[in-house]
Amino acid sequence: MNPIRKQFQYGAHTVSFETGEIARQADAAVMVDMAGTVVLVTVVGRKDASPHGDFFPLTVNYQEKAYAAGRIPGGFFKREGRPSEKETLTARLIDRPIRPLFPDGFTHEVQVVATVMSLNPEVDPDIPSMLGASAALTLSGLPFKGPIGAARVGFVNGAYVLNPDGSVVEGSELDLVVAGTANAVLMVESEAKILPEEVMLGAVVFGHEQMQTAIRAINELAEEVGVTPWPWEPSAVDAALVAAVDELARAGLGEGYNIADKQLRQQKLKEVRKAVIDALTAEGAHDENAVKRQIEKLEEEIVRSNILHHGKRIDGRDLSTVRPITIRTGVLPRTHGSALFTRGETQALVVATLGTGRDAQLIDALEGEYKENFMLHYNFPPYCVGETGAIGSPKRREIGHGRLAKRGVQAIMPTMDEFPYVIRIVSEITESNGSSSMASVCGSSLALMDAGVPTKGAVAGIAMGLILEGEEFAVLSDIMGDEDHLGDMDFKVAGTRDGVTALQMDIKIDGITPEIMRQALHQAREGRMHILDKMAQALPAPRSEMSDYAPRITSFTIDPSKIREVIGKGGATIRAITEETGTSIDISDDGVVKIASVDKQAGLEARRRIEDITAEVEVGKVYEGKVARLMDFGAFVTILPGKDGLVHISQISDEHVEKVSDKLAEGDMVKVKVLEIDRQGRVRLSMKAVE
């Protein structure tokens, strides 16, 4: 049991790979340590191919263990439960660059499991997990065309930073994760604070250059371990099947891909596919999965050829035209903000809801709890593509698309100081034919403006495709669903008129150069400007008035030492204020008070009462107060909540007063002037000084 270790410097951190000691019954297991963040990544492949051999059954699981951060899980069971949103997103991040590196026809089930075992809060486990998955797949002997490298790139003070610490990322204008092989970029996931396209592209190139260090280290580790390749060979091309499918399907598929309407097109293609499969599988002549795969290849060839050689897309558009856009805002009467964004056959109904501080989402992250004041949820019900299906908790894809849309919108959101509301956006995809996540970005921007949120401009998103054959390539603007999986690169860009806020790329082949990416980003910018123009026609600026049904939040500051007085014994005082005024009140430890109410006057009344409680008595000021109790020598008058002062009998009137009760009774409202506050805090009042 002699572990093999490989160590290298990666940005500011030292990374080590170790294999051979832990999880030895897996096909491969690598322990990755990056500055104290330790991830165990295992790979297991089934030796027999899947009986449903028309797809590659790859599963990626990413799990964070509470012990990694020295914590015991909360909840009744005190153990880890269903995956968090962060775990789901990281699993997708690992999956996306490794999936295209398995060969067509490989249908053995493969499972990659990444387990976070130790956490340095400054080092996100996503990069170590991706590197570990790459190393484990390389060592496993599976037909994996890797290894890949992965890097996080920040942009601070005009310079790129490799694998910045978490505290640096918070102040960075860019948080970009890039993954790729030695020769090609495969995946980009990023969020930016409105940066030019050139800066984004530069970050991708920088990250790809830097990750070569990690790729070399994995190759050296594999050499030292000695990898035994799997005994798998791609099945030989069945020339007779290729010819038969071509003869039976080409004409019908060609007709189908000339139908612009999605549902009519899919119906035609379905009929053609069924007829060909029935004809070629009769009496066991050919394997059904092999026929399906060949039909798919022919479809890909037809669509790609039409685009590359004729500049003709499925719905008849040229390469750079965006589908027709229609926009309506304020579509739902009692929501705080809403928008219906339709682009071709993709439609999103997006709703913005404003809430108070107590509506913030409490995230129990591995590095500790924090509050999320902006949420964006994306729903993709089966009816949006004309299908039936289960409706329930969000799937991985919905979580991923929601996060991408949130990244796109985040940069235009006001701070809590500027707009003290917790905001939740929900994007309901009501129709879908490609780029629904980007429709969600556009709809979210419009819904926020409809709700009266003071955004820093509008943001729009567009999904792009790219087809490359040798030296020829075509960039497609605003791709449809059928174009999505037939291209060599699909990427989504969200941004304002001034720059990019989110960029997501998935690249399936080698040969896509920075120059090609630059042209693609330029074309995406043109499309984005067109969409922003359409949005500006519908709603040029945030509404000046919020919905009548949205809470009004009043924010002001009190002396933190007075918080106890506002809350009262057992919360009695603040409870009385909220119940009597119908408001919601939040007080933070630094004395910031936020009062939320749908009725503006109720909010003002609650504020007045809190200010009265926290106010200091001022010498020389006249107050109206209630006589609290009578004494032989004078009367105590309540001038502020919880603050009484004494009106001495000699200060009640200019006339001689024999008995206090001759002039005053308990409960009387009187005007008094503060004469002095002695060292013990006792307040002397006068009624006659007012007269």
Swiss-Prot record:
InterPro entries: ExoRNase_PH_dom1, ExoRNase_PH_dom2, ExoRNase_PH_dom2_sf, KH_dom, KH_dom_type_1, KH_dom_type_1_sf, NA-bd_OB-fold, PNPase
Record domain S1 motif: where: 620-688
Known EC number: 2.7.7.8
GO biological process: mRNA catabolic process; RNA processing
SUPFAM superfamilies reported in the protein's UniProt record: Eukaryotic type KH-domain (KH-domain type I) (SSF54791), Nucleic acid-binding proteins (SSF50249), Ribonuclease PH domain 2-like (SSF55666), Ribosomal protein S5 domain 2-like (SSF54211)
Molecular function via GO: 3'-5'-RNA exonuclease activity; magnesium ion binding; polyribonucleotide nucleotidyltransferase activity; RNA binding
CDD domains named in the record: KH-I_PNPase, RNase_PH_PNPase_1, RNase_PH_PNPase_2, S1_PNPase
Keywords, ordered alphabetically: Cytoplasm, Magnesium, Metal-binding, Nucleotidyltransferase, RNA-binding, Transferase
Subcellular location, principal: cytoplasm
Ranges of residues in domain KH: 551-610
Top-level taxon in the UniProt lineage: Bacteria
Binding-site residues, Mg(2+): D484, D490
Pfam families, per database record: KH_1, PNPase, RNase_PH, RNase_PH_C, S1
Subunit structure of this chain's protein: Component of the RNA degradosome, which is a multiprotein complex involved in RNA processing and mRNA degradation.
Family the UniProt entry places it in: Belongs to the polyribonucleotide nucleotidyltransferase family.
Protein name: Polyribonucleotide nucleotidyltransferase
Organism: Methylococcus capsulatus (strain ATCC 33009 / NCIMB 11132 / Bath)
Gene assigned in the entry: pnp
